[in-house]
């Protein structure tokens, strides 16, 4: 989609962490008018987060993604771009959303991806589900962009004994081991930069019907620990484990998911460990591998993009910033 004077964007999940970053990124765009419509569940219409969106000029409307297709098509009739930041337990709702977007003539559909680059099947349970949705989008011939962002900064933040980084870690985040020798690089992105990347991507005709990998910096697990040790004077725990141990660690989570197949918590644990294996053992979370898979490289697309460095992020954490959020 070419840049025009006005762009109408609908977001599913605008009140969440990722959705909030996307809203911020869109509202920060200059040189054009951005009209944002947040699609929310009817029962959530008057929740504080949605009221705050309204106060920022976002139109918040009730939408039942599992309701009559005609009503959803009507809501999207004036929309140029649909962006999903839907809760990962509700990914299947993107199927009717895509159907409505196609019928409404939406010019670009961005599904909820925002993870590490990976092969189409067999890497993570959530990736498999997202690829099914992407296949459906492609069968519709609905223009799309698939965006991956690597690990989020706060998910890989090392702990220290004093607890100075604890407030910035996701709720319930376990201590992550270090895979192999800890020297495999991995792409990292701060949550507030994700929305800014997406705002650039949806205005870029080069990214239509493409996968895009954006990231801020590459770090190994050892480099993350070295950085935190240098800035805090404390040595993070380094628990090195073999590939066999990572596989066993993952299998424990898979067994729990098999016992509780409807548990979002069990699926979340499996997903975290699958991503850990893929990125920190198999080395898939890199621009080189992403290019091999056919992704466009955000560094090449947007060489002028400024971002929060990981070192500056850690400094801000040590100053008490970046409160806990979900992973």
UniProtKB/Swiss-Prot annotation:
GO terms for biological process: novofumigatonin biosynthetic process. NADP(+) binds at residues 13-19, 47. It is a single-pass membrane protein. It catalyses: asnovolin K + AH2 = asnovolin A + A; chermesin D methyl ester + AH2 = asnovolin J + A. It is found in: Membrane. The chain crosses the membrane at residues 9-29. One of its GO terms (cellular component) is membrane. The active site is at 130 (proton acceptor). Pathway: Secondary metabolite biosynthesis; terpenoid biosynthesis. Keywords: Membrane, NADP, Oxidoreductase, Transmembrane, Transmembrane helix. Asnovolin J 5',6'-dehydrogenase; part of the gene cluster that mediates the biosynthesis of novofumigatonin, a heavily oxygenated meroterpenoid containing a unique orthoester moiety. The first step of the pathway is the synthesis of 3,5-dimethylorsellinic acid (DMOA) by the polyketide synthase nvfA via condensation of one acetyl-CoA starter unit with 3 malonyl-CoA units and 2 methylations. DMOA is then converted to farnesyl-DMOA by the farnesyltransferase nvfB. This is Asnovolin J 5',6'-dehydrogenase nvfM. It comes from Aspergillus novofumigatus (strain IBT 16806). The lineage of its organism: Eukaryota, Fungi, Dikarya, Ascomycota, Pezizomycotina.
